[in-house]
Amino acid sequence: MSDNLAKAISNPLFPALDSMLRAGRHISTEDLDNHALLSDFELELSSFYQRYNTELVKAPEGFFYLRPRSTSLIGRSVLSELDMLVGKVLCFLYLSPERLAHEGIFTNQELYDELLALADEKKLMKLVTNRATGSDLDKEKLFEKVRTSLRRLRRLGMIINIGETGKFSISEAVFRFGADVRVGDDIREAQLRLIRDGEAVVHTKEPSQGSLLSEEDQEEQAQEEMTEEGEA
């Protein structure tokens, strides 16, 4: 073990940071201390995670995350279609002028309204149930599912909750859901096409669409959903 690697893993921040990365969290520049640790020891920690057949990735936007290979010793699961669609709409909002106008802060309702405005409503309703007709009850169920998706994406470091008011800011990590853009193309228009063409609701096992949610996180989510249903 190199001196630098020993220094990295002996850092008091490392145990919690390692757990977050293994659970699928993206470490963005907003997380100053953890991001600095990864930046300072990127080479050494990349070698460390290779032992688990997992790649420590630094995205062009500056955030870090783990990408397990098929033979990885670190498990991963795939996000739902709605999770991915919400992620793509979050990316669209991140690129929008509204983000500056709102000082980077959005509400759950604003995200939901944007989702309804940008995506095919019939496809959205099918994510609630195949028998959905677009009734007020179906829309309420969709809103609850969107809130669940936002909680999952928060665990992955895509959004940052602001208090308990249903408000959040969007991390640059949402570019995991960004459209591939050629030089000279309008990235926001490309993202809009990605949403409207229906690509955002196609289930895929591409690494760029994969979550790294641990089994523990999935169990916690299931318990949350059951609690919400009980309260309803």
From Swiss-Prot:
Q: Does the keyword Transport apply?
A: no
**Where does it sit, as one GO cellular component term?**
cytoplasm
Give the main localization category.
cytoplasm
In its UniProt record, which GO terms are filed under biological process?
cell division; chromosome condensation; chromosome segregation; DNA replication
- Output the superkingdom of the source species: Bacteria
Cell location = Cytoplasm, Nucleoid
User: Keywords on this record?
Assistant: Cell cycle, Cell division, Chromosome partition, Cytoplasm, DNA condensation
Listed InterPro entries: MukE_C, MukE_N, Scp_MukE
Could you tell me which residues belong to the region Disordered? 203-232
Compositionally biased region (Acidic residues): 214-232
State the family it belongs to: Belongs to the MukE family.
Q: What does the record note on quaternary structure?
A: Interacts, and probably forms a ternary complex, with MukF and MukB. The complex formation is stimulated by calcium or magnesium.
User: What is the stated purpose of this protein?
Assistant: Involved in chromosome condensation, segregation and cell cycle progression. May participate in facilitating chromosome segregation by condensation DNA from both sides of a centrally located replisome during cell division. Probably acts via its interaction with MukB and MukF.
* Name of this protein: Chromosome partition protein MukE
Q: Which gene encodes it?
A: mukE
